[in-house]
Amino acid sequence: MKNFSLWCDFIENSFLDNEFLNLLSHGINGATSNPAIFKNAILNSPIYKDKILKLKGKRTKDIYEELAISDIQKAADKLAPLFYQKNDGFISIEIDPRLHDNTTLSLGEAKRLYSAISKENVMIKIPATKASYEVMYELMKNGISVNATLIFSLEQSQKCFEALNAGLVEFRKNNIALKEQNTRTPQAVISIFVSRFDRLLNPKAKEQNRIGILNANLAYNNIYSKNEPNIRALFASTGVKGDDLPKDYYIKELLFENSVNTAPLDAIEAFKGKMDFKKPLMNFEIYTELNQIISQSEREKACNDLLSDGIEQFCIAFEDILKAL
């Protein structure tokens, strides 16, 4: 089994200088952030207070971006050896989630953030909404790596792949002299959210804590079958709430070839590199099991509800940061 990568779903300034380095020495190959993670870091960590005071008088979004960009740049530097040696070592930052339904503004923000950060191993996170597929295409076409996020349905994962791959094809066409130019091919991950499915549907399901795994397996099969190593499935929302499951449950159940799992710190600590790789189920096996657990209509409704809820949660977290600044 090859090309499995475990990333850390957490970022905070002082953490990057301490615990993060320890994680890197123990096999962590990347990191992700989102508005909720930055909200918790900026509003709860004292290290940001002096920085915020020095930035007073600026627009609140500008203050947020200076803080976030500084952390992302620091993480990118820590991860740079992995990027240049293994073509991994990415850190992700999300565009303003309030732009999720505006293609033009999303694309402009994504390019601006990438330019401001100015690190090759940064992925720009784009939510998988109808307005965003064109954004994913344009970023990949222009050599900017992408983390397509908030994927819940097979349809979303397919549309993400089509957009990302089309951009990748255009990038390659425009960079025929790739080796001479020393230009790196952009990478992409398609972030399939897992545990949120189970938390929503467990009360209606005939078997607990399986729907998220099966749904993620289905999306993974679709992505993996395309045989494009520069576009990987990433399993997100892999934290466990409560004590009914092992903290690393959603890591161990989704140890698949050419995939990424971004996990919270407690899940990483519980996992400790136990690489017992899984053989993905085939699609007919997945559908057979899913149909025994819950109806297709319930699953489809859950996909739509979870996407809407995920966007709303990130928008609220983003606005909470701005209000506090």
From Swiss-Prot:
Pathway: Carbohydrate degradation; pentose phosphate pathway; D-glyceraldehyde 3-phosphate and beta-D-fructose 6-phosphate from D-ribose 5-phosphate and D-xylulose 5-phosphate (non-oxidative stage): step 2/3. It is found in: Cytoplasm. InterPro entries: Aldolase_TIM, TAL/FSA, Transaldolase_2, Transaldolase_AS. Its EC number is 2.2.1.2. GO terms for cellular component: cytoplasm. Keywords: Cytoplasm, Pentose shunt, Schiff base, Transferase. The active site is at 125 (schiff-base intermediate with substrate). The keyword Cytoplasm applies. Belongs to the transaldolase family. Type 2 subfamily. Transaldolase is important for the balance of metabolites in the pentose-phosphate pathway. This is Transaldolase. It comes from Campylobacter jejuni subsp. jejuni serotype O:6 (strain 81116 / NCTC 11828).
